[in-house]
């Protein structure tokens, strides 16, 4: 796609305007809770760029008509979506994975100011790395960065076609209202329990209710299922069947996992065993795919290495400043020696380069796999030190995730002719907003991580994964429960095969195989979540087949609204509970 020439567009006299920045920060603060909420529920988040663009242009169109405000231009909206998406992606800095995992393993809990500073430091490192990679990856090599392309096309459409913009915004807001209203009614007025399916599996001791096979009235899961696609949805269903329909009952029958109450859901009892094969499947597939991706893009990585040989003075100063910040904060909060933090920053730069390139070519950011690389590295460098293992991986994974998100935003800006340095400023302000809002929401949602996480209410699958890897690297194979070793071996073979197939087979064939990350997640979330996610994916696929034009135009907006409505009300209810 060719770059747009700013001189050809008289639509936006300003770019980095006060209203663009403030709008982005406010929307970022409002949308960040959605990703924190969904991250703790199912371990996934979604890009908020398009939602932020729609909401901003809708708000300023109203201000234009009612208050006489000047038109909100496309480049202004680009600054807005850059700040908002960077704020909402703050969960990659550890809020739904290594930070709660550290609490579960060591009891370490951080107050809001300290947690916000840590999350900001990790994320701003990713912003600095992205600033150094932009010219090579976007201008010289013109990597795709699919999310950035999609956002650019959306911005062009909504600023070029007023009716379509208004219709998509109304669809987004209507879905948000329905989802949020249902959540409010179910929590405050009418208690509608999950509809447990009757009966049991053939020859199985637990009932379907014990295994969590039920229909859940959650529109958030339906919406998220629509966003992740049919392949991931069906993979979740397959993973749920293997975990809760086969391995769970088998582990109970062999005495490897305890049975719960006869009329209850056995999630907490079974997940402590099931997470091991699930984590193995996810980690092995992710690392296999990651290694093959690196081999595929090795020429481009060599170009980045040559580029890094001569850092400009200003950029070198920024990188040194961020490194010093991380060393001070990591030492103060977690007792990490300076050399450990410096090594983590150096590793972050290398892995963020890889993450940005893989994301640029495939649209997938391998944050989880990169975190595991660091955990394995520090398992050797600092054996037995759980804080070092988790928080250095937090640095690399968080920096890589924020870097990749920034590259997609910079791709959007390049296409529409925006100034990259202004986007970098917007990204930094968004990170600040996300750090303050995201940490506050996290602390309100789970004030007692040890008692609330890895439960049916808050499954926190990413926490389970990071915690399990840290336990094995710290305590050795003795941390693995009885009988799980054989299941892990089978999962490792499957993960190796699926991870390799995902990178080596033609795309049309790879899409027909299960998604290992999705199947692995199903091992550590309740079965009813997997069923709802699959249902959402099937509904979206059917709609796309029957009404392709309508689905393309409104599908993402409706699905995003379903996710946003329930999660925002869920966060609001948590604040209400805290306030008494």
Task: List the predicted regions and their residue ranges.
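Alpha-helical multipass membrane-protein architecture
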Residues: 1-580
């Amino acid at each position: 796609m060719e770059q747009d020439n700013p001189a050809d567009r008289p639509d936006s006299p300003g770019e980095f305007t006060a209203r663009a920045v403030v709008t982005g920060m406010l929307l970022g603060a409002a949308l960040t809770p959605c990703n924190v909420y969904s991250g703790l529920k199912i371990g996934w988040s979604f890009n908020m760029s398009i939602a932020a663009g729609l909401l901003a242009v809708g708000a300023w169109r109203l201000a234009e008509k009612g208050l006489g405000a000047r038109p909100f231009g496309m480049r202004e909206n680009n600054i807005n979506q850059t700040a908002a998406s960077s704020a909402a992606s703050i969960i990659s800095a550890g809020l739904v994975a290594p930070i709660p995992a550290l609490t579960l393993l060591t009891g370490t809990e951080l107050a809001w100011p300290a947690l916000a500073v840590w999350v900001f430091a990790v994320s701003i490192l990713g912003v600095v790395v992205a600033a150094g990679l932009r010219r090579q990856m976007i201008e010289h090599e013109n990597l795709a960065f699919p999310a950035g392309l999609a956002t650019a096309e959306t911005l062009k459409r909504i600023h070029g076609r007023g009716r379509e913009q208004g219709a998509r915004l109304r669809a987004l807001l209507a879905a948000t209202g329905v989802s949020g209203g249902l959540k409010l009614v179910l929590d405050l007025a009418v208690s509608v329990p999950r509809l447990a399916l009757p009966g049991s599996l053939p020859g199985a001791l637990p009932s379907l209710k014990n295994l969590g096979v039920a229909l859940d009235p959650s529109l958030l899961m339906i919406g998220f299922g629509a966003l992740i696609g049919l392949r991931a949805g069906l993979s979740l269903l397959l993973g749920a069947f293997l975990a809760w329909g086969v391995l769970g009952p088998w582990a109970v029958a062999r005495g490897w996992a305890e049975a719960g109450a006869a009329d209850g859901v056995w999630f907490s009892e079974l997940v402590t065993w099931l997470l091991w094969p699930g984590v193995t499947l996810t980690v092995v597939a992710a690392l296999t795919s990651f290694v093959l991706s690196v081999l595929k893009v090795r020429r481009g990585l060599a170009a980045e290495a040559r580029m890094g040989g001569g850092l400009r003075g200003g950029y070198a100063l920024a990188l040194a400043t961020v490194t010093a910040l991380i060393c001070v904060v990591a030492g103060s909060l977690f007792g990490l020696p300076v050399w450990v933090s410096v090594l983590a920053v150096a590793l972050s730069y290398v892995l963020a380069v890889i993450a940005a390139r893989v994301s640029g070519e495939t649209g997938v950011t391998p944050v989880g796999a990169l975190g595991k690389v660091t955990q394995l590295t520090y398992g050797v460098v600092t054996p037995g030190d759980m804080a070092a293992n988790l928080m250095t991986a937090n640095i690399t994974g968080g920096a890589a995730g924020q870097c990749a998100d920034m590259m997609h935003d910079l791709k959007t800006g390049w296409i529409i002719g925006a100034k990259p340095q202004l986007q970098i400023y917007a990204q930094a302000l968004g990170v600040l907003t996300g750090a303050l809002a995201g940490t506050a929401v996290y602390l309100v949602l789970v004030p007692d991580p040890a008692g609330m996480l890895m439960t049916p209410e808050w499954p926190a699958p990413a926490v389970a994964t990071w915690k399990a890897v840290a336990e094995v690297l710290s305590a050795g194979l003795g941390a693995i429960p009885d009988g799980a070793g054989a299941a892990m071996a089978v999962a490792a073979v499957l993960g190796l095969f699926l991870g390799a197939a995902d990178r080596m087979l033609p795309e049309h064939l790879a899409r027909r195989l299960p998604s290992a990350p999705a199947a692995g997640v199903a091992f550590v979330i309740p079965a009813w979540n997997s069923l709802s996610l699959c249902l959402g994916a099937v509904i979206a696929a059917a709609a796309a087949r029957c009404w392709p034009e309508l689905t393309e135009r409104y599908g993402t907006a409706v699905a995003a609204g379903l996710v946003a409505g329930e999660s925002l009300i869920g966060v609001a209810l948590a604040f209400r509970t805290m306030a008494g």
